[in-house]
Amino acid sequence: MIPIVLQTDFPNLKLVNKGKVRDIYDLGEHLLIVTSDRISAFDVVMNEGIPYKGFVLTQISKFWFDAFSDIVPHHLVSTEVDDFPAETRPYRDQLEGRSMLVRKAEPLPIECIVRGYLAGSGWKEYRQQGTVCGIALPPGMVESQKLPEPIFTPSTKAELGAHDENISFEKATELCGGDIAAQAREVALTIYGRARDEMAAKGIIVADTKFEFGLRDGRLMWIDEALTPDSSRFWPQDEYRQGGAQPSFDKQFLRDYLETLDWNKQAPAPTLPDDIVLKTSEKYLEALFRITGLKP
């Protein structure tokens, strides 16, 4: 079994960013992204690690980066520790299976979300205003209903512990420049369409997903993670029923459990029972197998 990694500690490497899930180290020409087994819900990081989570996210990202490299360049160089610079080798046990050596890029100041179904914050806004990120939708739609066509709904990038905010495409063009925003929208919609079709053949609905892009030498590059259970809503096709919330292959199971608690959704996080940790791990592993055919 792969060891659970909650924190990384690499004294001779330069830590440049510690996110809710990933630790990023600067290796000079490249970055090293280490995906821990931390899990967050409602923007609060839980105390417990989820077995295999970092492995699952890394392997799924590699699968999609490789699959769609014809659409847009991506930042992934290798997930094999043997390909990493020599100074990383002492930490092989913590890096194996959960790390990516990546090219550097300047991240865009927005997150690029594509929605194919009415769920989450999109459903909440639609109920109140009949729109999603200002995009008008037909009246009378219900929760989890398929949209007439996928829509691009960017958001801001919030600091750790804060909430992202949905923004209009016009605001995205102000933040990124019109040409870059338009290119990011086109690429995101293209990748989503391909992934939706490939996943449908595997019995999975991609309800929505979040992309991050950066610029390298002035060219758009796909960065961060790729169509993982942390950045996407994956629903089992055979259980899909519009008109309510759906079972999923992501951390929605954990969110649903936390909703049953008397917790204000602020730190400190409540203690997670062993069965909830195990069931969450099983959800991630099922997503890995359904998408890639891999088992750890």
Curated annotation (Swiss-Prot):
Any Pfam family hit: SAICAR_synt
Pathway this chain belongs to: Purine metabolism; IMP biosynthesis via de novo pathway; 5-amino-1-(5-phospho-D-ribosyl)imidazole-4-carboxamide from 5-amino-1-(5-phospho-D-ribosyl)imidazole-4-carboxylate: step 1/2
Cellular component aspect of the GO annotation: cytoplasm
GO molecular function, one term: phosphoribosylaminoimidazolesuccinocarboxamide synthase activity
Chemical reaction(s) catalysed: 5-amino-1-(5-phospho-D-ribosyl)imidazole-4-carboxylate + L-aspartate + ATP = (2S)-2-[5-amino-1-(5-phospho-beta-D-ribosyl)imidazole-4-carboxamido]succinate + ADP + phosphate + 2 H(+)
Catalytic activity, EC: 6.3.2.6
Protein name per Swiss-Prot or TrEMBL: Phosphoribosylaminoimidazole-succinocarboxamide synthase
Gene: purC
